[in-house]
Amino acid sequence: MKISVAPSLFDRIPGLCIGIVAVRAADNAAANMEAEAFRRRCCTEANLLLKMDPALAEKELEDYREILSAAGVKEGRTAVEKVFAEYRKLLGVSAAEGVPEDPEILLQPKKATLDELAGSDALPPFNPIMDIIRGGMLKFHVEIHAYDMGNRKTPLEIREAGRTFSVNLGDKVCTADWLCRDEEAGAVTEDTENILILITGMKGNRRKVAAARNELARRMKSAFDRAVEVGWLEGKETEFTAEI
């Protein structure tokens, strides 16, 4: 499995980094207790943190909006923004709720009741791979995408497309506008076995991207009992080929 990124994307966005996890021969159709437990745990942690800080992850989401703008995308939301918006809506939490006008004033942490935490599991399950991906976005506040690599022969490419960038699997478009507007090509379904996971970030959250990559690699290996491989793209490193 291979991914290549147009060097101009790294020129356009200084400090851009992409953590990679490759997984081979995963069974994404069967019930997976580890994936389900991880999704639930991430939901509970996010709910607890949102009770204490309703503006949780807003700084990171704004940074990703700036990345989209730098990449030429004028409209659209990133995957991590969509996940947080969906989760907040399901919990009935507003990002502006309880935020002090003076940033120097620290709010007294709110206490979450057992009943409130019992409703944490609001983010609906999809399939084991996507449950781990979506849980990872709630946990680390980073942009994570997974692509079905089919028979592993067709490379995944992030190409320059006019003023913006697109994600392509061979001659098919996965994402018309990089990081948003998902298409059908490369979509992860119950039949998916071989995947490339991309965790995208920048200089300011580089450590979170690395932490998310390492944890997702560990979770995928444990949940599916299959071989995984990790990679990293940054600066002049614009290609990665998995050996598994």
State where each predicted segment sits.
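Charge-biased, low-complexity intrinsically disordered regions
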Residues: M1-I244
